[in-house]
Amino acid sequence: MLHGDITSSNDTIGVAVVNYKMPRLHTKAEVLDNARKIADMIVGMKTGLPGMDLVIFPEYSTHGIMYDSKEMYETASTVPGDETEIFAEACRKAKVWGVFSLTGERHEEHPKKAPYNTLILMNDKGEIVQKYRKIMPWVPIEGWYPGNCTYVSEGPKGLKISLIICDDGNYPEIWRDCAMKGAELIVRCQGYMYPAKDQQVIMAKAMAWANNVYVAVANASGFDGVYSYFGHSAIIGFDGRTLGECGEEDYGVQYAQLSKSLIRDARKNGQSQNHLFKLLHRGYTGMINSGDGDRGVAACPYDFYAKWVADPEGTREMVESFTRSTVGTEECPIEGIPNKKVAHR
């Protein structure tokens, strides 16, 4: 893990994250103009960072947030589509991979159902290698249709990459799911606003440490008339230490080199902090000393996960028993979100 240079090597992947200023757009034409602005930025960044293999832009960086529902549906993209072709041309020209946000991607039943909040990983030939749909939309505000799975794809120089989006990252389960599928870099693109800056900085670092994984966070900056976005895009080592972090500045860039051999060596030879290995080899020292084998315990000890898989509706009722039974709350009502239990006749 290296920080401070503009290079990369056969062993290191040069990764850049961008504090992209949150745009406020209303039409398809404006979205495409903004996509061209992102494309120009990619080419310029590659000139200044010749080692850059992967560039990452935040959630909402392409479309902005369409606070008007009609505009949100009208500007929703297809994948591939006009926006992705602009990005593809830039990736080919700069010979770089990219992660790009599409908010939204048209649902298969568009316009009857809400769009998805989507990220794509694109290679340096302009091909879409991974398409991820946000599993945990930021309810009650975000109206995206939820996705249902994570992916791992081989990225530049063979680094294994997973994509997650913003509120996804508040749930340790998604980080573990990606890491246990073999991800070596988890990319978290977000359009996160104040007041949650400190919590999000902590979360990214903690999840890198807990999952022995590189983390790259690209966050929006600026004010869009509704929210103020805190930036702090960052690249974090698999030991949880920050390699580079932006401030709140618009269009700030951070860059670091992520070693393939180093993370693979740590996962193979690390002992006391090899969290992925230890989770499936629980208590092996005590088991060895007790004559009960030399690999520890593999069985899952956490009742919640077994119950959730076996009985999702029953598990939901269990959670509602100590939280609430409606998605909304009467004490802070939000238009369109039910906050009273429906009476049954």
UniProtKB/Swiss-Prot annotation:
Its EC number is 3.5.1.4. Residues 13-260 form the CN hydrolase domain. GO terms for molecular function: amidase activity. The active site is at E59 (proton acceptor), K134 (proton donor), C166 (nucleophile). The gene is amiE. CDD domains: aliphatic_amidase (cd07565). It catalyses: a monocarboxylic acid amide + H2O = a monocarboxylate + NH4(+). Catalyzes the hydrolysis of short-chain aliphatic amides to their corresponding organic acids with release of ammonia. It comes from the Bacteria. It is an enzyme of class 3 (hydrolase). It comes from Bradyrhizobium sp. (strain ORS 278). This is Aliphatic amidase. Pfam families: CN_hydrolase (PF00795). Keywords: Hydrolase.
